[in-house]
A protein has these predicted regions:
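Secretory targeting signatures
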Residues: 1-37, 53-54, 194
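Long, compositionally biased, intrinsically disordered regions
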Residues: 29-199
Length: 199
């Protein structure tokens, strides 16, 4: 036989258990940082989007010839990029080139930082030429690359971005990419790399 006292004890026990359970859930929510990106694939989507944008910039610039023109924006007398210190640009790519304008419009103006590097081979070593350096990439950085073939008869650009009469063959050792085939028309094959991350 169940007495009224025993029924009240069960009710009290149930209320105490529910309070304990709700308190545990409330505590767990307070100690765990819950953000829109927690437990989702949003970070990966952002990285993928940044990578696709950088790849699209490189592909479109390669298709219309302005990717190579960006690589030819070189001051052979100073032996570095026009208007940049020896270690590249630190505030975005130069606006005098289509590549620079497009990278700045597509990435920098939208809160995405980027580094632009060119890789080439010299004496069996892979060398990196830093074109734009906007900082150390985050752990969630994305990378896009494009391969470009440079020829001896490609002409360097002046500070305004207009082609000069100086070819890569004329520039000789003053250009950063060594002549991989001195007896042939190819100067070298380089890999253009854009590393992107949110600022």
């Amino acid at each position: 036989m169940v007495t009224p006292d025993r029924g009240q004890a069960h009710t009290l026990e149930a209320v105490a258990a529910s309070i304990l359970l709700l308190s545990s859930v409330a505590f767990a929510l307070q100690v765990t940082a819950v953000t829109p990106l927690t437990g989702s694939t949003s970070n990966q989507r952002i990285e993928d989007h940044q990578s696709v944008v950088a790849e699209d910039v490189l592909a479109s610039q390669a298709a219309n010839g302005t990717l190579k023109a960006g690589l030819l924006y070189w001051n052979e007398s100073a032996r570095h990029w026009h208007g940049a210190p020896w270690d590249g640009y630190h505030d975005g790519a130069p606006e005098n080139t289509s590549l620079g304008r497009t990278l700045n419009d597509a990435l920098l103006d939208r809160g995405v930082a980027y580094n632009l590097n060119v890789y080439f081979w010299r004496n069996d070593q892979r060398i990196r030429e830093q074109v734009v350096y906007l900082g150390e990439p985050s752990d969630h950085a994305s990378v896009a690359t494009w391969t470009v073939t440079l020829y001896d008869d490609d002409r360097l650009s002046d500070a305004d971005g207009d082609p000069t009469g100086t070819t890569l063959a004329d520039a000789g050792e003053a250009y950063f990419v060594p002549d991989a085939d001195p007896n042939g028309p190819v100067r070298g094959v380089v890999v253009v790399e854009v590393v992107t991350w949110r600022m």
